[in-house]
A protein has these predicted regions:
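A conserved beta-turn-beta hairpin within the catalytic core of GNAT-like acetyltransferases
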Residues: 67-77, 87, 106-110, 138-142
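Short amphipathic alpha-helix that is part of the acyltransferase structural core
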Residues: 1-58
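Generic C-terminal helix-cap and adjacent flexible tail
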Residues: 149-156
Length: 156
């Protein structure tokens, strides 16, 4: 059974923070051979949130939601990740559904943005994201900016 959690950054304890940083490093830095500073100063500020999926006390899926203080800046979903041990279980779909739901619940009138690896454009399109930029290089991997407008009728 999977334990899904949607936490404000202030709710993260040290073991949880360690687990999410470890998973991000394992996949984004080591597996994808992409040396970059993952700890970017955005994890523990403002209204930022963290979505976590746990099974047997192991973090198996994660996403970060960044809410800027600027009301004109879209809410950003990023660091979307499923551990190697849990791939093939459709957790990415469940994770993105929960990420979009969290954004709609917390910031219903805000558009959403994500920087997608270009080959995952169709995956994110199923959640209402459309291309917002041309394809660009980020750390040697082709990416595309994608945006999702708020659903009509949503109120703050």
């Amino acid at each position: 059974m999977i334990d899904w959690q949607d936490k404000h950054h202030a709710e993260l304890d040290a073991p949880t923070l360690y687990a999410l940083l470890k998973l991000r490093c394992e996949v984004f830095v080591v597996e994808q051979t992409c040396p970059y500073l993952d700890v970017d100063g955005d994890d523990l500020v403002g209204e930022n949130r963290h979505l976590l999926a746990w099974r047997d006390n192991q973090l198996i899926a994660y996403a970060r939601i960044l809410k800027s203080d600027d009301p004109h800046t879209p809410v950003a979903i990023g660091r979307v990740i499923v551990s190697g041990a849990a791939r093939g279980e459709k957790l990415g779909v469940a994770l993105m559904k929960r990420a979009v739901e969290s954004c709609e619940r917390n910031w219903p009138q805000s558009p959403l943005y994500l920087s997608a690896q270009a080959h995952l454009q169709a995956f994110y399109a199923q959640f209402g994201f459309v291309p917002a930029t041309d394809i660009y290089d980020e750390d040697g991997i082709p990416h595309i900016g994608m945006r999702r407008e708020p659903r009509p009728g949503k109120k703050a």
